[in-house]
């Protein structure tokens, strides 16, 4: 059992017969009454986000999530095929499991597949990915003093804001946490 006082971002817990990942939490000590922990949790099966309040010191069950390194092979209609790097066993995941992750997945990419009691519940991407720009407007020379941006579409179909100097064919390093441009690759 884990005390809610020990919550950390990314911790997985089992509450109300569901598996939750702690996205955000805050310890609150009101002037009157007992302390409590306000948390924002993501259901790993459905993807739903819920705010939940726990009394300070309350205990919750930890969820033992198993991470397996796998390589993304290809998309087959609405399913996506991954291969285990150790056993070479292939696993298919529906697009329902891969919501935001589809913006960054490209063939050959290494990911962590998360399972709970044999059931696949999610995919964890690397913190950054390198993707090639397939479409963007040409930048206007000399117009970089203002830090202006333009939109660009990368090879996966994802569209993001980039600096004006980025051109088609450039390789970009993108943060998978928030989808933002970091630098050219």
UniProtKB/Swiss-Prot annotation:
Name the source's superkingdom. Bacteria
This chain's source organism reads Staphylococcus aureus (strain NCTC 8325 / PS 47)
Q: Which family does it belong to?
A: Belongs to the elongation factor P family.
Q: Which GO terms describe its biological process?
A: peptide biosynthetic process
Provide the taxonomic classification: Bacteria, Bacillati, Bacillota, Bacilli, Bacillales
> What NCBIfam families has UniProt attached to this entry?
efp, PRK00529.1
Q: Name one GO molecular function term.
A: translation elongation factor activity
Q: Which UniProt keywords apply?
A: Cytoplasm, Elongation factor, Protein biosynthesis
Under which name does UniProt file this protein? Elongation factor P
Q: In which pathway does it act?
A: Protein biosynthesis; polypeptide chain elongation
Which residues belong to the signal peptide in this entry? none
- One GO cellular component term, please give it: cytoplasm
Q: Where is the protein localized?
A: Cytoplasm
Question: What CDD domains does this protein map onto?
Answer: S1_EF-P_repeat_1, S1_EF-P_repeat_2
